């Protein structure tokens, strides 16, 4: 441990804060960007108070360290006040940032994001881990190249007790009903995210600026059909999103095995393999 601390101290001395970059801090952590002088490489520094720190976060970093869709972790250290994670920096921001400038994406970009995000989550699910907070802000994106799933502090081992943690907008019916954590929590959230990037709206909000509570969201999940703008011209994508967001679990795309059978997914795989 002393050697690790010494190594980090030497590393940090060679870094300078990139103060011109304004990042939005998460609910449980403060994020800054530092540049390492000798290599000119930038890193995320994430500082988390001990009361908010979840050991599963560095665990998932370690678990997925060979997967290109997850952030590499270089240091994980703690002091009396906080825990520090030093990770790869992705310069282009997240999907939420992108949607502020381009409120509606088009093909083939949507297919690229869908393919990589589903591939990333399936790799995580193979380890029996649920991300549990899939949303626009937690998908970093090098435009037209690659996504990176980030923020693993709310990850759950499948089968563990579930609570109302995460972002309400992406809660599945089962999460609202406090079922045990399961991979289908993530697949529902993928459906919401794909709807957002392809329409610029939320599937269950009457107004994009509306703040949903759990009760209102659940009522609309039951009562409302997912509808699309009149000019939406991709029937296969529309059907796929509706398949992910069907209220009835038995008729929904609740697993990777079911997703693989969908026409839109098959077309993406074929496109990627050309």
UniProtKB/Swiss-Prot annotation:
Keywords: ATP-binding, Kinase, Nucleotide-binding, Serine/threonine-protein kinase, Transferase. Residues 17-265 form the Protein kinase domain. Pfam families: Pkinase (PF00069). The active site is at residue 133. It comes from the Viruses. Gene3D superfamilies: Phosphorylase Kinase, domain 1, Transferase(Phosphotransferase) domain 1. It catalyses: L-seryl-[protein] + ATP = O-phospho-L-seryl-[protein] + ADP + H(+); L-threonyl-[protein] + ATP = O-phospho-L-threonyl-[protein] + ADP + H(+). ATP binds at residues 23-31, 46. InterPro entries: Kinase-like_dom_sf, Prot_kinase_dom, Ser/Thr_kinase_AS, Ser_Thr_kinase_AGC. It is an enzyme of class 2 (transferase). GO terms for molecular function: ATP binding; protein serine kinase activity; protein serine/threonine kinase activity. The keyword Coiled coil does not apply. The keyword Kinase applies. Its EC number is 2.7.11.1. Belongs to the protein kinase superfamily. Ser/Thr protein kinase family. In vitro, can phosphorylate histone H1. This is Serine/threonine-protein kinase 1. It comes from Lymantria dispar multicapsid nuclear polyhedrosis virus (LdMNPV). The lineage of its organism: Viruses, Viruses incertae sedis, Naldaviricetes, Lefavirales, Baculoviridae.
């Amino acid at each position: 441990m002393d050697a690790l601390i010494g190594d980090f101290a030497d590393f940090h001395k060679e870094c300078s804060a990139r103060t011109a970059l304004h990042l939005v801090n998460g609910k449980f952590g403060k994020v800054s960007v530092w540049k390492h002088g000798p290599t000119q490489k930038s890193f995320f520094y994430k500082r988390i108070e001990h009361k908010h720190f979840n050991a599963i976060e560095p665990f998932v970093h370690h678990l997925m360290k060979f997967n290109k869709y997850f952030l590499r972790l270089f240091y994980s250290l703690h002091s009396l006040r906080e825990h520090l994670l030093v990770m790869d920096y992705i310069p282009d921001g997240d999907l939420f940032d992108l949607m502020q400038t381009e409120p509606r994406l088009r093909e083939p970009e949507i297919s690229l994001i869908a393919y990589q995000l589903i591939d990333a989550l399936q790799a995580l699910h193979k380890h029996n881990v649920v991300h549990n907070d899939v949303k626009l802000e937690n998908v970093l994106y090098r435009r037209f190249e690659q996504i990176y799933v980030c923020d693993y502090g709310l990850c759950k081992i499948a089968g563990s007790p579930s609570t109302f943690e995460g972002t309400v907008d992406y809660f599945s019916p089962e999460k609202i009903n406090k079922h045990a954590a399961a991979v289908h929590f993530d697949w529902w959230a993928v459906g919401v995210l794909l709807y957002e990037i392809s329409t610029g709206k939320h599937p269950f909000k009457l107004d994009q600026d509306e703040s949903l509570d759990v009760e209102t969201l659940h009522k609309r999940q039951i009562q409302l059909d997912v509808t699309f703008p009149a000019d939406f011209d991709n029937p296969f994508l529309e059907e796929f999103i509706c398949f992910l967001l069907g209220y009835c679990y038995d008729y929904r795309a609740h697993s990777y095995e079911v997703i693989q059978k969908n026409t839109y997914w098959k077309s993406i795989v074929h496109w990627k393999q050309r």
